[in-house]
Each structure stands twice: as C-alpha cells, then as structure tokens.
UniProtKB/Swiss-Prot annotation:
The protein's name in its UniProt record: S-adenosylmethionine:tRNA ribosyltransferase-isomerase
Classification via PANTHER family: S-ADENOSYLMETHIONINE:TRNA RIBOSYLTRANSFERASE-ISOMERASE
Pathway the protein acts in: tRNA modification; tRNA-queuosine biosynthesis
Disulphide bonds in the chain: none
Enzyme Commission code: 2.4.99.17
An annotated GO BP: queuosine biosynthetic process
Family recorded in the similarity comment: Belongs to the QueA family.
Subcellular location: Cytoplasm
C-alpha cells in the first residue's frame, strides 16, 4: 500500500509534552467501526469491558538508554550521541549513533564524561560494526550488571523526538515515562498505552472480574524511525525482543475458550501476542525477536480489542491501528480527536479500538 494513504495533518498544539494527572484522567475515545465515536476517560475502562475479558500488559521497564559521549581518534575528538535499542550480549548493545558519519568501525567512544562523572569508572565502548540508518554494534568495556549500573548512572531517558525537540528530559520524566507495573528492564521507549493505568484502576478492573496478564516486549528506538519508503512493502521493521510465558499463553487460550475477549494494552502487547499465535488461533509460549509489520489486510489471530494512544502520521503504528479498525474508520477517528481537543503521542490521550471484523481469523 502507498504510505501516503496513512498521512494526515496534525496541529502542533495537539502534541502532548506532559501527561495529565492523575494518569487515568486522560481522555479515551471508544472506536467501534460503523458506530458513532464515544468520548470517555481511561478511568471508565472497566465499564467498557466485561467479566471474563482479559487485559494484556507489557511489563517492560524503560532504561536511561540515551548516552552522550566523545569519539576519540588520534588528533581528533568528536561528540557523539548513542541511543541503545537492543541488548545482544552481556557487554553488547545495538545502538543508533548521531551523527553516524563521524564514527567508523574500530572507533572508541567514551560515554558519561561531559558534565557527568561515571562513579563506576569509565563507560567506554568500541564500535564493532556499522549498519544502515546510523545503527552500530557497541562492545562495552564493562559487562552484565556492572554495565547496567553504569548506564543507569550516566544515561538519560530517551524521550521521543517530538518531545525532546521541545524540552529537555528531567527528573519528572523518569517517573512519568514508566508504567506503574514495569519490572523487566530493557526498553528504550515506554509502552505508552500503559502509562494511563494507576494501582487503583488496576484493582477496580480486577474486582470486576477482568483478568490481567503480562508479557514482555523490550520496545526499541526503531519505533521512532520514520517510514522512508513510498510503499509499505518496502519498509523493514527493526526487531524487538519479547517473551510470552507458558502460563500467560494458557490463560489467554482459556479466555477465548470460554467466550471472553483479549484486550491488548498497547501496540507492543498486540504485536507480541500476534507473533506468538499460530494460524489455528492458539497462543503459544514465545521467546525471541519479532519484526512483525501489521498493515491493512492482515488477519488478526488472537486480539479482539486494542487500547492505544494516538500515533504519528505515516507511522507503522497508524498502519497497525488502520489494519485493526479500518483505514477509513481511523482517519475519521483521528479527525474527530483533533477537532475535539484530544492530546496526541506518548504523553497524550488514548483510544479503545474494536476490531473491524469480530470473528477471529487465521493469518
């Protein structure tokens, strides 16, 4: 499909730079294909679901993966930024470097030495490989838990570009840009639909007889990369590491067997559950990388509803929601949301989407 089919105009003032407080007071647009849109709030969510349904959350935890460093070469020092996006070994991370043209294989980069001292000593890395789109493989001198502590000491929360271009990261972001149930460290970006949940809302949902299950997908910096291709068939997704346990897979299959619905909180949960589901509609344990790219025409195997924020024009995430609820429906929903003052992107409001075809299909 042509990428320009997923374009729309978004006034800059609709981009949220801070979340609402409390978290669950964000607006929630209920989208049911073929029916009028309904304005709600996130705290209404348990009224929109049914006992026996199951919510699926991504429990990944954002790490301070934005590093500032100096590339040192004989007689030449240059400033370099690195956004870590996938751990591939105890001492190895794939990262996006900026500006990448200043770096070549074999270069040494010293992180955390400009205004911030690394209390564990130097946080240095070697550029082992260079790839496309500014991607590189960094091999650090530190390893394992010691490396994790050093990154936490000198790193910054990698705010999305549309926020970072407007203001710097601060201490409030370390709390705001993290779900209340985050526990598995490794994400570069937050699973933002989950940012709306409070402990009190989670308790109310559970009390209504709605199950809560957790999966892990470490969201990578590739989620911020623009789609540069003119056709969706020419776009390549960056892989992300995920895990679905046997217990969670069995529980979700039981939900469908008794007629309940699976509601994914966020596109990351949806992409992982769909990756773990076979053509027979059975969710299976999963551990590994997924680069699933969902566009209109995809036949969903497991997920019945999706709670998600409002996404960028021409983005893979707007393509995903268009596959889920229909391209025309989503254009209409976004036009409605823009006119009605909904806040967009990571710190913005949310939508609850029902699938355009409520029968589960094989892919």
């Amino acid at each position: 499909m042509r990428v320009d089919l997923f374009d729309f105009d978004l006034p800059e003032e609709r981009i949220a730079l801070r979340p609402v407080e409390p978290r669950d007071h964000a607006k929630l647009l209920h989208v049911r294909p073929g029916e009028p849109f309904e304005d709600r709030h996130v705290y209404d969510l348990f009224d929109l679901l049914q006992p026996g349904d199951a919510l699926v959350f991504n429990d990944t935890k954002v790490i301070p993966a934005q590093l500032e460093g100096m590339r040192e070469r004989t007689g030449n020092i240059s400033q370099v930024s690195a956004t870590l996006h996938m751990r591939v070994g105890p001492d190895r991370w794939k990262a996006f470097l900026r500006p990448a043209k200043r770096v070549k294989e074999g270069d040494r980069i010293r992180f955390g030495h400009s205004g911030t001292s690394c209390f564990l000593g130097t946080l240095d890395a070697t550029v082992a490989e260079k790839g496309d789109s500014g991607e590189a493989l960094l091999v650090f001198d530190l390893s394992g838990a010691v490396l994790d502590e050093a990154i936490a000491a000198v790193g910054h929360i990698p705010l999305p570009p549309y926020i970072a271009s407007k203001r710097p990261e601060d201490e409030r972001d370390r709390k705001d840009y993290q779900t209340v149930y985050a526990r598995e460290e490794g994400a570069v970006a937050a699973p933002t639909a989950g940012l709306h949940f409070t402990p009190d809302l989670l308790e109310k949902i559970k009390a209504r007889g709605i199950e809560e299950h957790f999966v892990t997908l470490h969201v990578g910096a590739g989620t911020f990369l623009p789609v540069k291709a003119d056709d969706t068939g020419d776009h390549k997704m960056h892989a992300e590491i995920g895990h679905v346990s046997q217990r969670t897979a069995s529980a979700l299959n039981a939900v469908h067997e008794r007629g309940g619905r699976i509601i994914c909180v966020g596109t990351t949960s949806l992409r992982l559950i769909e990756s773990a589901t076979g053509e027979d509609g059975v969710v299976r344990p999963w551990s590994g990388a997924t680069d699933i790219f969902i566009t209109p025409g995809y036949r969903f195997r497991a997920v019945d509803l999706l709670m998600t924020n409002f996404h960028l024009p021409r983005s893979t995430l707007f393509m995903l929601v268009s596959a889920f609820s229909g391209l025309d429906t989503m254009h209409a929903a976004y036009n409605y949301a823009i006119a009605d003052g909904y806040r967009f992107y990571s710190y913005g409001d949310a939508s609850l989407l029902e699938r355009i075809d409520h029968d589960r299909h094989s892919a």
